[in-house]
Regions:
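C-terminal structural segments of small proteins and small subunits
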Residues: 75-104
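Short acidic active-site motifs
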Residues: 45-48, 90
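A glycine-rich helix N-cap at a beta->alpha junction
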Residues: 48-75
């Protein structure tokens, strides 16, 4: 099994850093999982968010998504399926599953 990296993103800033970090980890053969929560769910609507598709398992906090007024716009977020709009339990699973866990 490949080494894995979990990334918790809670800020709607620095998407470029998240993309670069994810690309670097993927290039090194790491399995990457990213959970977006709080204001970070806004990043799902940024054009560069699509650069993460295929490089990581992407999940968004459904509660944060709704709290930010995005309910009904789930299909606009690339690479994130219905089941990937999850609760903080998904974040807890990610932290338990991954060899390394970063908070941004």
């Amino acid at each position: 099994m490949a080494e894995s990296l979990g990334i918790l993103v809670s800020s709607d800033r620095h998407l470029d850093y998240v993309v670069k970090l994810t690309r670097a980890a993927h290039k090194k053969g790491k399995e990457v999982q990213i959970f977006f929560t709080g204001s970070a769910v806004k990043l799902g609507f940024e054009p560069d968010f699509a650069k993460l598709v295929g490089l990581a398992r992407l999940s968004l906090c459904d509660v944060s998504f709704r709290a930010n007024g995005f309910h009904g716009r789930e299909k606009e977020v690339p690479g994130v399926g219905f089941k990937d709009f999850a609760t903080q339990a998904r974040n807890a699973e990610m932290s338990a599953e991954c060899d390394r866990y970063l908070v941004l």
